């Protein structure tokens, strides 16, 4: 039997807008002090467990890039090769980007709020190109042209993420490399849904905490040997996931 492939998923550390309880999406916000500490702890967990990444795949958003850099430095792996892609970006929250989650919940009610936040195939209203939180003039997306997302549901995230998983991440895993993917709550939910075969309905209940490595051992068909993977700090992961689930109720 072939050796299991090792995939490490890491959601970026807590950001300034996580702390302010704002919809972030593709808005490029910095890590908070808590997020920096989470990145450092993630690196310590990787080093302590002996799970040392050989290659990094990350989004083009600074909160993921910085989290990965902080974690890899703490783990002594700053030198590994890196690939960045918009396909690992957070879900685009459309016109909700920059809006307060608690205010949105109060204004539109729990049913509409839950639909926009957790529905598999219903996106929020699209963002206008002249909105201050639009990415229409962002040079990192210049090659996307008219295909630049202006809103997304989780289904859209899966459709733009999976081609990259198959073309770039799977080959690294197949070569025997330990792969670190540092990304976002929804792009990682999209990947976990694919890996674990989670249904469209059940994925709404999955929450991924910030800054805690989630390790998957995959067989030769890239299927999890342990469904759901294993967090390197299970207690902190459970508390973090509960905090993510409660977003919107927080003032």
UniProtKB/Swiss-Prot annotation:
Any idea which residues are catalytic in this one? 12, 90
Which top-level enzyme class is recorded in the Swiss-Prot or TrEMBL entry? isomerase
Which reactions are catalysed by this chain? (2R)-2-phosphoglycerate = (2R)-3-phosphoglycerate
Q: What's one Pfam family here?
A: His_Phos_1
The residues that the entry says bind substrate are 11-18, 24-25, 63, 90-93, 101, 117-118, 185-186
Key words, A-Z: Gluconeogenesis, Glycolysis, Isomerase
Where are the residues marked Transition state stabilizer as a site? 184
Return one Gene Ontology term, BP aspect.
Answer: glycolytic process
Q: What is this protein called?
A: 2,3-bisphosphoglycerate-dependent phosphoglycerate mutase
Organism name: Clavibacter sepedonicus (Clavibacter michiganensis subsp. sepedonicus)
The taxonomy runs: Bacteria, Bacillati, Actinomycetota, Actinomycetes, Micrococcales
Q: Which gene does this sequence derive from?
A: gpmA
């Amino acid at each position: 039997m072939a050796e299991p492939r090792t995939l490490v998923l890491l959601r970026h550390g807590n950001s300034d807008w996580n702390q302010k309880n704002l919809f972030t999406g593709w808005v490029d916000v910095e890590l908070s002090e808590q997020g920096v500490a989470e990145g450092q702890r993630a690196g310590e967990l990787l080093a302590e467990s002996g799970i040392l990444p050989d290659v990094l795949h990350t989004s083009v958003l600074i909160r993921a890039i910085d989290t990965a850099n902080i974690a890899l430095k703490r783990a002594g792996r700053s030198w590994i090769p890196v690939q960045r892609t918009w396909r690992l970006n957070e879900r685009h929250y459309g016109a909700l980007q920059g809006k307060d989650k608690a205010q949105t919940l109060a204004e539109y009610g729990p049913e509409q709020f839950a639909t926009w936040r957790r529905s598999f195939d219903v996106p929020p209203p699209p963002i206008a190109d002249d909105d201050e939180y639009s990415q229409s003039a962002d040079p990192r997306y210049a090659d996307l042209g008219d295909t630049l997302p202006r809103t997304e549901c989780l289904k859209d995230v899966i459709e733009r993420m999976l081609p990259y998983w198959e073309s770039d991440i799977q080959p690294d895993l197949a070569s025997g490399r330990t792969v670190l993917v540092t990304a976002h709550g929804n792009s990682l939910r999209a990947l976990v849904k694919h890996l674990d075969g989670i249904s469209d309905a059940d994925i709404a209940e999955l929450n991924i905490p910030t800054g805690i490595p989630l390790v998957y051992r995959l067989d030769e068909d890239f299927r999890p040997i342990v469904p759901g993977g294993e967090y390197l700090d299970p207690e902190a992961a459970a508390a973090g996931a509960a905090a993510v689930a409660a977003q919107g109720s927080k003032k």
